[in-house]
A protein has these predicted regions:
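Helical (often loop-to-helix) elements that flank the catalytic cores of nucleotide-handling enzymes
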Residues: 1-5, 9, 40-54, 91, ...
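Histidine-centered divalent-metal-coordination microenvironment in nucleic-acid enzymes
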Residues: 98-101, 135-162, 199-203
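Catalytic micro-motifs at enzyme active sites that drive phosphoryl/nucleotidyl and oxygen chemistry
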Residues: 83-91, 128, 132-140, 187-190
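Short Lys/Arg-enriched alpha/beta "domain-start" segment
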Residues: 283-285, 291-309
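Conserved small/polar residues in nucleotide/adenosyl-binding loops
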Residues: 311-313
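Long, charge-rich alpha-helical interaction segments
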Residues: 175, 220-266
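Accessory, usually C-terminal, subdomains that scaffold auxiliary metal cofactors
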Residues: 192-214
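SsDNA-processing nucleotidyl-transfer enzymes
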Residues: 20-109, 113, 190, 250-269, ...
Length: 313
């Protein structure tokens, strides 16, 4: 990633105060939990039911968010949900759970995003051919990949009256599907799909690390190369430019790990000094630097003197 965004409250508010976040893809948004990472630092979980974009953005006024998420599950009461292991409070009643697959390929660049698109397309086609789930849409996360959002028509697990057992059965059902997908060789996140308490990035909101907007794709876009539609994705004015390829990484070089081979024969006459020369010169280039050092004879033989020199380099 070319640079790190340093958001200000004014930059974020200029986007959200002029934007309507489309929640229509969620059957009943008031049954979902909304969370966001605030510009001030802490994570905030909505303490109100969210039924519209306006109500959600009103909650941002105290501290603008860098990243906004929504739960994959819907609950009878999504406010102040108890933790799974909390036995002191009544267990929440799970009403529905979206089937979500997350595919990310790092880093954020066109080449890796194209790889993620192809992987997402392959998974979409596999799901259509091998399962009964109904795909709602595919979302560009705003950074390194995509989310497939779907519904499972098999509602048998939700007929369980005990809320704890119901949630366990739904998780087990999702885990079985996830295992099939992984066994099929698809590079999906191994946690998101089977986690009933998971939150995913909310479409229509800014990705805090890139400035690009998490966006529901037109159905045909996932079948087209990324470079044919990426410029149609909305982004904040401060968004970073998406690199074409990953940054070049120079491998770490350590002389101490080199397999230095020295002759075992004794040298008849020893010079007063040992010369150690290191150079970054590459054939055909100019103006490359070189490091030359004389090592004291009193440091010992060649191997010992080089080992001692490495301590000082």
């Amino acid at each position: 990633m070319s640079r790190i965004l340093d958001w200000s409250g004014d930059e974020l508010s200029s986007y959200y105060l002029d934007t309507e976040i489309d929640l229509s893809w969620i059957d009943k948004s008031s049954r979902h939990q909304f969370r966001w990472k605030s510009l001030k630092g802490p994570w905030i979980t909505s303490d109100r039911r969210i039924s519209s974009s306006k109500k959600l953005i009103e909650l941002f006024s105290n501290s603008m968010p860098t990243d906004v998420y929504v739960s994959t599950s819907s609950w009878l009461d999504p406010i102040n949900l108890p933790r799974i292991k909390d036995t002191k409070r009544p267990s929440p009643i799970l009403l529905d759970h979206l089937v979500v697959f997350d595919i990310d390929i790092r880093p954020f660049c066109l080449i890796r995003l194209e790889e993620a698109r192809k992987a997402t397309l392959n998974l979409r086609n596999w799901l259509i051919e091998n399962t009964d789930i109904k795909i709602r849409h595919i979302t560009f996360s705003g950074s390194k990949g995509f989310h497939i959002i779907a519904d499972d028509p098999d509602r048998e697990s939700f007929s369980e009256p005990d809320p704890v057992l119901r949630e366990e059965k739904v998780k087990s059902q999702r885990k079985q599907l996830l295992n099939r997908v992984i066994e099929g060789g698809h590079p999906v996140d191994k946690v998101v799909t089977a986690d009933t308490r998971r939150v995913i990035r909310l479409p229509g909101t800014v990705h805090g690390k890139t400035g690009w907007v998490c966006t529901i794709l037109n159905d045909e876009w996932i079948e087209l190369p990324v470079n044919e539609w990426i410029n149609k994705i909305p982004r904040h004015d401060s968004a970073i430019k998406i690199p074409k390829r990953p940054p070049i990484r120079i491998p770490k070089f350590s002389l101490s790990k080199m397999n230095l081979r020295f002759p075992s024969k004794k040298i008849a006459s020893f010079p007063q000094y040992t010369s150690l020369e290191l150079s970054s010169h590459v054939s055909g280039t100019n103006d490359r630097s070189a490091f030359v050092s004389w090592l004291p004879r009193k440091w010992g033989d060649i191997r010992t003197s080089i080992e001692l020199s490495l301590i000082h380099i």
